Amino acid sequence: DPILNINEIQKARNKEAVINDHIKKIVLEKKFFLSIGRFTKQKNYLFYLSCIPEILKIDNELYFIFIGKGEDKEKFLKISDKLNISDRIFIVDHTKNVHYFMKNANALVLPSLWEDPGFVLVEAGYNSCAVISSDCPNGPSEIIGEDGGYLFRSNSKSSLVQTIGLFLNDSKKSIIFKKVNLKKRLKRFTSFYHATNLKNKILN
């Protein structure tokens, strides 16, 4: 399981990431969904990309930021051009501070085909970032549950679009409720929890 250092996350949240002015403007002034991970089959970004035109029909003010590199990146960019949505897609190859993006994102979107169990999901939860995830094996369903975020059927376009619609139309109170539930569930991923657990095992 991933182990988080909460103090490091708090420090990073308050530091600006090194990004160009255009992306910085999106992060600070626009509504955007964030996705983090390599452009590979596992992360399933090509599937997610094919859903974005439908998502923009629900909310045409959205932008989409992806952090990562990988073998599918060039194909991803070509398809975004064909779909005529390249003005809404921004890719950051690498950053030392994902927490800055998570703090400002409307939601983290995790369209993966599988996870183990999803470190990005755990980090997002601790940054009070809403999570929209596939119900893929090894993590998301167990961590998010029914009240910690928004789950859609893995690799189902209709389910993803519908779930994002539910999120975009959800009340602020309901979104906060889910964020709080997720953060509570993530306590077992903190370094403090692991240190306390180890101490108890030694003493007992």
Residue ranges and their predicted role:
Residues D1-R13, E71, K96:
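Short beta-strand->alpha-helix junction loop in the catalytic core
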Residues H94, L113:
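Aromatic "clamp/platform" in nucleotide-sugar-dependent glycosyltransferases that forms part
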Residues E123, C136-L151:
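Short acidic/histidine- and often glycine-rich active-site loop of Leloir-type glycosyltransferases
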Residues A130-S134:
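Short hydrophobic beta-strand element within catalytic cores of glycosyltransferases
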Residues E146, Y150-K157, L166-K172:
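Conserved acidic donor-binding segment of nucleotide-sugar-dependent glycosyltransferases
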Residues I175-L203:
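A charged, aromatic-enriched C-terminal amphipathic alpha-helix characteristic of glycosyltransferases
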